[in-house]
Amino acid sequence: LLVMASGNNGTDCDKKIYYPQGLDKTGKRIDNLIRIGASDINGNPGSISNYGKNSVDIFAPGMDITSLGENNGYTTSSGTSIAAPVVAGIAAIIRDYFPKLSAGQVKEILIKSVTPMNYKRVKIPGLNKKGNVATYDSLCVSGGIVNALNTVKMAQQLSSKKNK
């Protein structure tokens, strides 16, 4: 599974194309590429995160994340390049514990097992001086934020069905 940061322009990727788009030559979604947006500690999309109802698959924590820095120190960073490794790590756990699942199945599980945020009206990322709001299902395919526990549970269910 290829995990890709969607970008940090606060742009609707359904309207402005960023490559790779995650589509094959015929326009069909590629099942082994997942595009990630960044969310903050309150579950809101990051103000810089790209988004798109059809072009960003899932949001993950990616704003004000503290990690290791230079000289045995720490650093705080934000963006979809911070959120993408969160999803990659969860995908790696799934592939390790459930190696018979395909990349496409792992992507589907990640998308279907989110913490749904469709009910929450959030500020649309970008230079949003008008205060425009939307629900998560208009900002990404999954309509929510990655949930590691739900992902493991769903993978376990799917894997046990395949083994019967």
Show which residues each predicted segment covers.
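Active-site neighborhood of phospho(di)ester-bond hydrolases with catalytic His/Asp-centered motifs
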Residues: 3-7, 36
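Extracellular S/T/G-rich loop segment that most often corresponds to the catalytic His/Ser-adjacent loop
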Residues: 18-96, 100, 144
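Active-site environment of divalent metal-dependent phosphoester hydrolases
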Residues: 9-14
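C-terminal subdomain of the subtilisin-like protease fold in secreted/lumenal serine endopeptidases
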Residues: 31-35, 98-164
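VWA/integrin I-like adhesion module and closely mimicked acidic/polar interface patches used
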Residues: 1, 15
